[in-house]
Amino acid sequence: MVSSSNASSDQLSQESLVIISSSSHEGFSYGKRHPTVALNGSLNKKLRVRSGSLEELSDSEFDVSAKEEEKKSTELQDPKSIDLETQFSDVESDLDSLNERNKGADMLELTDDESVHELPGSSRDFFDENDVEEMSMELIKMYSIGLNAEGVSEFKKSSASLVLPKNTEKSTYLKSNAVRQKFMTKYDLPPVLFLDQLESRTREHISVCDAILTGKVSSLYYSMAKTVQKNSKRQVITNEELRDLNILKFTAGYFGSRRQAIVGMLILETYGEKLKRNKNPVISFWGPYDFSQYILAPEVLSYLCMDDFKLNNIEDAWDIMQTTIEFGTMVADLSPLEVYEIECEEESLRRLRLPQQYSSMSYRDDPRRKQDSNVG
């Protein structure tokens, strides 16, 4: 790095720098001068650049340069020079003026009465389980990605595999197996989907997003999203509001948050531009990414649930999705999504000396067999 000094021309007219050199690496560093002695195998030299060559600075020249840099740094850090009232003031828009600007826009209004789709009391009690909510939030943070073109392809490859702390890894497998046995017995849930199965089945039902966006079908998750928007004083949901939100209400049941995130990205690829242009206040409040992730994705997965259980109406699918969230966060989110993750799971079970019954492959078809048959 190169630092410009404000010293007078007779004191220091050229650019000065401190070079810290060692046998293993060389680099530039700002800061006060250190004594000219060996420091961790490196030697500090006072040099300046003149006509393409390096000359050593005198102590007085270096001190002038160092004092000027220290003065600049102090001025930048002086809190009196920053108007905190202006810099951190809340920008709250007038909702009436917002509605005025949106007059005449294509506003989304659902055709059914949204109030009839409130969550049953049993589901509300389930959502209050702290351990499940904490697990869900950890998984969502672990698999969340930024909104960019490269992130989409990286996420679809599932490059980030789930890694658990060693002291909790075995207990997590034990609890996951117990939850799986409970829900498989009670609900006869289908095997957790692999990535290719998930993408294929999602594309069969992704067009339901059009029906939701035009108000042709009702949506439980849109109704809940609208309630959040109505209770907020802001135009756009904040990170603080997301943290305070009971995110389990927007989790896609037995599919889990990991697979829900992938469906959300598939939806964003297809409907991202349409969501950006939509002037509906609920969509504007949540934004294209979160609206795809927390509203449209669980809605699309609810239609996969209808197929799994051969249901005739979406309301029954919503009930199943709401009551199987624990399976999603404790079983589906820990189950291999891609083929290479199966080997990781098998290695973990061997290391922990857990029998085959704790493997997710004890109830799922192994896709490696299909690959082997295709090769043969």
UniProtKB/Swiss-Prot annotation:
Q: Where is the composition biased (Basic and acidic residues)?
A: 64-81
Classification from the root reads: Eukaryota, Fungi, Dikarya, Ascomycota, Saccharomycotina
Locate the coiled-coil region(s) and give their ranges: none
According to UniProt, the name of this protein is: Restriction of telomere capping protein 4
Stated role: May be involved in a process influencing telomere capping.
Protein origin, superkingdom: Eukaryota
Which GO cellular component terms, listed alphabetically, does the Swiss-Prot or TrEMBL entry include?
Answer: cytoplasm; nucleus
Positions of the UniProt region annotated as Disordered: 50-81
A Pfam family? RTC4
The cellular location(s) given in this protein's UniProt record come to: Cytoplasm; Nucleus
Listed A to Z, the keywords are: Cytoplasm, Nucleus
